């Protein structure tokens, strides 16, 4: 048998070989927060001291397997991993999971796992990457808040223009109404004019009061009104004047000529023609 020192040295060499051929997995980032509809990238780094021919990898979310492809001679056997997930391998040791676009269902804890099957079976698991998906975009919210004063300014401008238009319309309507009243178009501002018509020629002296009444009845009255005609008074026929008083004169204010009429002669006394002397006179 060998000495105890030789046995101890052999054990140390075997342990060193085992450590040199061990498999390690590092995962990042530990925490990732993105907005809904954007892109999320998770990285898994697989390290092994010795060369390997076949590597099996696996991604899980909250303990559920998303995908489990193989890597042989630097190529992936599967490029899809879960909903909206794509895998890519970059030699010698980088495995990337890309989620595009992310939704609220992508929030959770992601773990990368790797195993070497040839030449010997070895397994390793990475740390946890926690993914949080925000339903709203803080940047868009800030943009909405920043644009809100501008929107208020636009509303204020439109409201001012509307008020100005209403005031101008009221002023124009009032001015037009005043002009119509000043021009006499208002029903309360009517002008009336009475014209008394008298036929040419003076009446004969032999005509009695009844004849004058006929002349008065023959007189015409013209009335002009703007815009409404003046109400016409009922025409009153002149009554014959008793002898020997003359007929009453028309109302003052009307240019009517007055004719003096002598009393009506008796039946025995006939009117004498003008220009002949009386009996006994020469």
Curated annotation (Swiss-Prot):
TM segment ranges: 151-171
Lineage: Eukaryota, Metazoa, Chordata, Craniata, Vertebrata
Residues on Cytoplasmic side: 172-282
Name of the protein in question: Transmembrane and immunoglobulin domain-containing protein 2
One Gene Ontology cellular component annotation held by this UniProt entry: plasma membrane
PTM annotation: N-glycosylated.
Pfam families reported in the protein's UniProt record: V-set (PF07686)
Signal peptide: 1-22
Ranges of Pro residues composition bias in the record: 241-253
UniProt domain Ig-like: residue ranges: 23-129
Extracellular side: 23-150
Organism: Homo sapiens (Human)
Keyword check for Transit peptide: no
Superkingdom field: Eukaryota
Chief localisation class: membrane
Biased composition (Basic and acidic residues): 204-217
Expression sites (tissue/organ): Widely expressed, mainly by epithelial and endothelial cells, including bronchial epithelial cells of lung, breast glandular and lobular epithelia cells, urothelium of the bladder, skin epidermis, epithelium of gastrointestinal, rectum, endometrial glands of the uterus, ureter, fallopian tube epithelium, colonic epithelium, small bowl epithelium, stomach epithelium, including both chief and parietal cells, trophoblastic epithelium of placenta, and pancreatic acinar cells (at protein level). Consistently expressed in veins and arteries (at protein level).
Positions where Phosphoserine occurs in the chain: 220
Annotated S-S bridges: 44-112
Compartment list: Cell membrane
The protein's role, per its UniProt record: Plays a role in cell-cell interaction, cell migration, and angiogenesis. Through interaction with HHLA2, costimulates T-cells in the context of TCR-mediated activation. Enhances T-cell proliferation and cytokine production via an AKT-dependent signaling cascade.
Residues that carry a glycan: 73, 105, 127
Polar residues bias locations: 218-227
UniProt-annotated stretches for the region Disordered: 201-282
Gene, per the UniProt record: TMIGD2
One example GO MF annotation: coreceptor activity
Protein's GO biological process: positive regulation of activated T cell proliferation; positive regulation of angiogenesis; positive regulation of cytokine production; T cell costimulation
Subunit structure and binding partners: May form homophilic interactions that could regulate cell-cell interaction. Interacts with CACNB2, DST, MIA and NCKIPSD. Interacts with HHLA2.
